Amino acid sequence: KGDISIANGKFGFLDIPGEKSVFIAGPNLNTAMDGDTVLVKVTKESVNSKSREGEVLQILTRGKSIVIGEYQQNDNFGFVRSRDNYKDIYISRKKKKNAKDGDLVAVKLYFWGDSERKPEGEIISVLGDSEDTSALIKALLINSGITEEFSQEVTEEVGKISENIQAEIANRKDLRDLDIITIDGEDAKDLDDAVYVEKNENGYKLLVSIADVSFYVKEGTELNKEAIKRGNSIYLVDRVIPMLPRKLSNNLCSLNPNEDKLTFTVEMHFDDKGKLIKNDFYRSVIKSKYRMTYTNVNRIIDKEDEVINEYKPIVKMVNEMLELSKILRDAKKRRGSIDFELPETKVVLGEDKKIADIVLRKRGEAERLIEDFMVVTNETVAEKLFWEEIPTIYRVHEDPDKAKMLTLNETLIKFRYSLTNIDEMHPGKFQAIIDKTINLPEGYLIHKLILRAMQRARYSNKNLGHFGLASKYYLHFTSPIRRYSDLIVHRMLAKSIEKFIKDKEKDKYMAAFDVISTSISKTERVADKLEEDSKKIKLVEYMKDKIGEVFVARISGMNKNKIFMEL
């Protein structure tokens, strides 16, 4: 039993946690479609590491009733060919809407087909030409059940939220006089986090102030229900689909400069070796002094006079931030945290929504600095909630699967590297190989293979540790505007501080967080795939007029049928 995935409308796979996948040939799908929950009979066991084979016995739950595909017109009727379905979908003349041959369409099914008849449906939306990128991205969203607009109930609820926070400010620690700053990408509008560092004779004081979304988004509201459903914001190549309406994500909650903002602050004191000496947690009000970008902070670090003169009041603090981040990074490395150095491309669109540039996204000291501060903040909050036995949602990354480690080791040995004692895996073993190969020709491939062999991080109501970070306690606290997990953590941290949780409530929260963890882990996977697929659509459009040209490429993977390359 499980959810089936259909590949190219030709065959399917059933993935069952802890077991080998089951391959299902097209004729054995028995009307199952992508995303359906099905009961499968295994007809052939795995041989030589191949998948098992099976057939669908029963459709338990239909994953969706709306299917995306390309419309094909015949004389008196039409068909929609979908990658999510083995059989074409019959469309009568009356139910074709205004679709033309070759259009990308959304079809609502009213008959799923049987052994004698094809599935039947009605076209509910004509998205456009099947090669138009805006139509293809729209199709991605519909196919994943993503709605851009918020319901009228949510919109009305948000409209009633007051922008006046003066009464609340009196209840908070006032940090408005401090030179607190935000550091984000140039195009970021949902500014979650602000930072402040002060060097003293004992070491460093770090304040990380995070937008207090929980002040605005209350449990039991329509807004909260919608946030749970969305789970996270989605950053497509051409747009952002926010978890929260823009009045909150880009305005009330966003830590825009020179505005009073409600925040949740984690105050941490470190010695000069990066050891946490003491901490404090409190609700606060801040007024960010500068909306800094990674680019400008990197230029300050590189000692460029023009930028140093522009941001003179915070230059000393930025340099102290750099000192502290390097100390924290070294401490992370000593305990074995894995740090992948894999190149990432950023697609830049012009006003016509076509690719204007493709740039290699580099991780400079500013990016690392914020990453270091956010990681240590997440760890600090996680450890507090764990030892106080406060229910919450953790970000967990489990130990690698032994079978995958054995396969990885076979490849590493061919490159004259190896993992020792696979029964006792430690992240430091992987980091040692990464360090050795970082500047070698085979380094890129080895780092990718190690990454693919890792488990996928997920959310859980149980603290299972974070293997990649070598952390005993970890969660997500620092981005509540765009991740629902962080909003949960804020609420539970508030209960911890205010001693506002009774023992009999803990079981209720644990059960609720178990369900929510599963849901938001799934919405995160959907968002990641949508973000990657939308980028691929634009890249394919960009390469259309380059057919026949010769490029230097790097082989990034292969199987018995294909070789994958990166330009």
What are these regions (language model features)?
Residues 18-20, 45-50, 94-100, 160-172, ...:
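Short, glycine- and charge-enriched coil/turn segments that flank and shape catalytic ligand pockets
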Residues 31, 41, 59-63, 108, ...:
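Conserved, well-folded catalytic cores of nucleic-acid-processing
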Residues 1, 380, 403, 412-567:
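Structured C-terminal cores of nucleic-acid metabolism proteins
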Residues 25, 107, 184, 191-417, ...:
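Feature marking long nucleic-acid-engaging regions of large polymerase/nuclease enzymes
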Residues 1-210, 214-260, 291, 299, ...:
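Charge-lined substrate channels and their catalytic hotspots, especially those that engage the 3′ end
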